[in-house]
Amino acid sequence: MVFTSMNTQVRVPQPPPVPAAVVNPTVVTPAGPHPEEIDEAFASSHELRKRTSLFRDISTFILGQASQPSAEPAAKKRKLEEKTTSQSAPAAPGGSLVSSATKAWRTYPGVSFSIPQRKKFTLELLDKKDGGIRAIGASGNVEFSIAWKDVDQVFCLPIPEKAKKQHNFVVIPVHGDGINPLPEHLQGAAPEPIIWTFEEATGKNIVEGEDPGPGPMAEAIHHCLIQAGTGKQVIFPDAEEFASATPESHRKGDKAYHVKAHRGSKEGYLFFTSVGILYGYKKPLAYFDFASVNSIAYAAVLRNTFNLVITTQTQEIEFGMLDQADYAGINDYVQKHGLQDASLAAARRAKKLNVNKPKDKSNGTAPPDADDAEEEEGELQKAERELQDQEDEEEEDYDPGSEGESEGSGSDSEDEDGGGGYDEGDGDEVEADDDEMEE
């Protein structure tokens, strides 16, 4: 038999202990309504002592908010918010160049840009009339763009001193040549050029049947320019315009189309093209179309180098340390386009009508048709007439009484205009009249 002690107490099972609420160590639990320290601090002002509980509640709330960890990093959260905002924004009617929702006609991923940002982007071409060029970042947003209607010129020029063949596409915007004064509506903020690099495929990267050079990309841009109705095309270097006397330093078999020059302390390259002179590729770029050039002169001509001075309507820009070997080629280019004569500047500005129209030749140097020649001739005649009117006004202001006071005053202009002294025929007639008088 089993005996149970009378003094043994039967243990009743206890429920599991309830865990105590976790108290945030950073949150200070407020004490009584008026601790002794507060009573002593506000002994002279009972109204302020009554408001201390409100300030304790506010501080407790702020400490509680600060102690809660963020669900994700701030940078990641910001990117997601930006992406959501851009995707939720409705697209403009008919599509928009700056809207990533607008589909591109051509896409080129991983393109290296140097201006306005030195970074790789996806290059996109939109071939509609309201299309243009845009760069897409890694997040899918449009980083920068330019409409076709705002494009002044597009160049495809070789990058000098490279072992592999590389080319820079240079887009000059309207009012972004870095030379001419800006119109008032731009408020001093000139549009920036766009430059990206194209590297020719070599070796295993060459695709059979495809042009490894920049030709296909240039043709795509040309197509878009035609669709937009700009009448422009991509300008390539042309040996008929200018080619350096020194071949490429890293590729002896290739012609060089540049001349190394300094603008101040910065070194760059001058390109003499069929539409003007471009200086690049570092900021600030400068593009001199023929209409903006008043005259071109030479300075500091030494045995090995010389300086080129380009005068515009508003300023004079000097490029230094040009190789003397390229002097003859540059001078031929200047003479060919009449850039050495400031008196022809008005005629050059008059020629700036339908400039850089699509030509039969790829380099854009083919002669215009008969209708364009007649229109251009009319503008030239107008410019000549304005110059003649100006000369006539100067002759009207001339004082004949001062002719004998200065030696040779006005003799050159009189000989050129044929309005001064007698020619040989007139002299013979005068002598004949004198003989008749004597008889």
UniProtKB/Swiss-Prot annotation:
Primary localisation category: nucleus
Entry GO MF terms: DNA binding; histone binding; nucleosome binding
Keywords: Chaperone, Chromosome, DNA-binding, Nucleus, Transcription, Transcription regulation
InterPro entries: PH-like_dom_sf, RTT106/SPT16-like_middle_dom, RTT106/SSRP1_HistChap/FACT
Subcellular localization: Nucleus; Chromosome
Family indicated by similarity: Belongs to the RTT106 family.
Cellular component aspect of the GO annotation: chromosome; nucleus
Region (Disordered): 66-99, 352-439
Keyword Transcription belongs to the record: yes
Self-association state and partner proteins as the record states: Interacts with histones H3 and H4.
The keyword Flavoprotein belongs to this UniProt entry's keyword annotation: no
Compositionally biased residues, Acidic residues: 369-378, 389-439
Compositional bias segments (type: Basic and acidic residues): 379-388
Listed name of the protein: Histone chaperone RTT106
Annotated function: Histones H3 and H4 chaperone involved in the nucleosome formation and heterochromatin silencing. Required for the deposition of H3K56ac-carrying H3-H4 complex onto newly-replicated DNA. Plays a role in the transcriptional regulation of the cell-cycle dependent histone genes by creating a repressive structure at the core histone gene promoter.
